[in-house]
Amino acid sequence: MASSLTPRSPYPKKENLGNARRGMGVKPGPRRNVLSAINNGGGTNSDTASVDGGEGGAGPAAPVIEFTGREDVERLLAEKMKGKSKTDYKGRTEQMSEYIKKLRACIRWYIELEDGYLVEQEKLRSTMDAENAQHAKLEAQLSSDLEELKAAHLNLTRQCDSLEESFNKEKADRMLAVESYEKERQQRESAEASLDLLSVDLERVSHEAKRFSEQLKMVQDTNKRLQEYNTSLQQYNSNLQADASKSGDIISKLQKEKSAMMETMASLKDLNNSMKNHLDSSRTSQQEAIRMKEQLMKEVDCLRIELHQIREDRDQSVSQVNTLSAELANYKELAGKSTKDCESLSVKVSAFEETCSMQQEQIQTLQKQLAVATNKLKLADVTAIEAMTGYEEQKVIIKDLEERLASAEFQIVEADKLRKKLHNTILELKGNIRVFCRVRPLLQDNDSSGAEEALISYPTSVESAGRGIDLMNQGQRFSFSYDKVFDHGASQEDVFVEMSQLVQSALDGYKVCIFAYGQTGSGKTYTMMGPPGRDQKGIIPRSLEQIFKTSQSLESQGWKYSMQASMLEIYNETIRDLLAPGRSNNFDLSTSKQYTIKHDPQGNTTVTDLTVADVFSSADVTSLLAKASQSRSVGRTQMNEQSSRSHFVFTLKISGSNENTGQQVQGVLNLIDLAGSERLAKSGSTGDRLKETQAINKSLSALSDVIFAIAKGDDHVPFRNSKLTYLLQPCLGGDSKTLMFVNISPEASSVGETICSLRFASRVNACEIGIPRRHTQARSFDSRLSYG
């Protein structure tokens, strides 16, 4: 700073005046407040800028030089030497020394000013450090309080969910108990309706039950053999195929026997109805007998009263006759009455005797009637006792028949479970993709003609029942067969029951993938999501309810599970995070993010920067599904009022560990709702809808190319042709259990798309992707979710 303020000198030696300051012995005075001494006008104070008389301090005292501001410094720098000639070196030297002293005083003033600034800066810095420390302490305390509040809020939320779940469970238990009581009452009433005719078929049913027991024993033996072979399935695959064919024959026989039993049950139902009518007539007869018994009892009571009255009248008449006879004798002996009086008395006696004889006859008649009524009463009592005894016997027989029927039905159910288990085992050994077909019901606003009603039919043969579907188009029949076919009357519960075992595999450590395919408006979203309501929920909410319920039941065996969920959509070949914080109402604030699909050597798939949420109950997933549904891209077309315009992918990562055995499992459940294929001529899409339709059809076409390449066994499978196929690569070409739902429309206007969907499903069903592998070894997972 001093060198910048020093004026240029005409002499070269004055260029380094700033450096000569140290050699002159000029020492700065003590620090002081800025300009305080100068403004106060102190003369000899050490805080005042002064100049010594000479170089050694021997000269006369110089006047005090004070600087009050920048103007004084500039004035000093602008000062010129005058009054001396060029040859007067001594005078010029004195002027130069005086000028140097002024410069030294100026420099000293600047140094003191700078020292004051430094002191004030140090004070401000210490004050700022103290304020920052206090602010950090306060911020840490606030963060701690906020974390405690969040933890308390989360705890209260979990307690509320737990209480609500307990309340719903108790309410459901009560409703179940009421339904059970009502069902038991109805069964008791129906049991009372079975009487005499069941005894005719009792022997035949017992023979059939015995035959069913023998067949069940044979099935159990077969099951035992299959369980023994299960330990060496990989080594003896060909042998198991032979056993599977034998099991198929047994299953066919069981299906036939099941049909026979269903016919027997129908005949038993008819028999029950006839027995119910017979019981009603018996009850009517019994009530009539009881009414007649009561009437006879009343008549007997009346007859007894009349008999008692007649006996009293007879006794009174006899006493009167005796009295008159005694009087007559007395009259004859004592009074000597006239003959006329005697005749009148005789007439009276005869009348009395006639009355007595008539009353005697009436008494005999009443006694006979009383005996007949008593016999009838005894006969009615005997009949009632016999009827009650027969009723109790029939009740015992009916109970025995019901137990046998329930046992036979249980055997049929167990045989069907065995069939499903064997079928799943065969499919796992083959490594095929399983395919289920579901037919959507005709909509109410569509006029269904006879041609539309006859468009789709279902084979009734034992081999194809429940697995085949026939389609008529222009007089030509197209037949297809899949692992399961659901007609238009199948409920959401029926659909989920068939695939519940596959969902269970995710908890066992397998990778599971379920996706819905079909044209737009064929019911894919209804099958996967379903509308709100207990009976209408789709595969995704039902699967999550089963997983959480099963994981809770396994806690008693030492298992603990942690689950993470994520949801995304592929819209116009762009991945969108449906759970992103800034996404709502189909508007994505995080479109700047570039989501990348990555596969690792273990077959796990991750999507970078994707939102992953920890879930602890089905209620947590329900709220996430509601948020994702609001964010998903939907639109209106001519074929569908609410058409999904993107592929929806829900993924649940499951990590489980057993404290007792130390075993760890890691499973993944992928549930996918594909966008529907559509033809531009029918959908009438334009603008953005046209771009969406083209992107959807392109990705589905890429999926078809992948399926065809796998079916033909090509060395190269074009998984990278679309985001959808690249995301599904572990499911279509890895070691996962994969199930495809093909949804079709029964309308005649959609028959072309329906045939294409069914043909594509047949090719998918023929694809062999490898045997599923269970992941039981502990591995470090990325913090983001795996789609493997």
UniProtKB/Swiss-Prot annotation:
UniProt keyword annotation of ATP-binding present: yes
Gene3D superfamilies associated with the record: Kinesin motor domain
Pfam families: Kinesin
Positions in coiled-coil regions: 121-430
Origin superkingdom: Eukaryota
Residue span of region Disordered: 1-63
Binding site for ATP: G518, Q519, T520, G521, S522, G523, K524, T525
Domain Kinesin motor: 432-767
A GO BP entry: microtubule-based movement
GO CC list: cytoplasm; kinesin complex; microtubule
Family, per entry: Belongs to the TRAFAC class myosin-kinesin ATPase superfamily. Kinesin family. KIN-14 subfamily.
Name by which UniProt lists this protein: Kinesin-like protein KIN-14H
Species assigned in the record: Oryza sativa subsp. japonica (Rice)
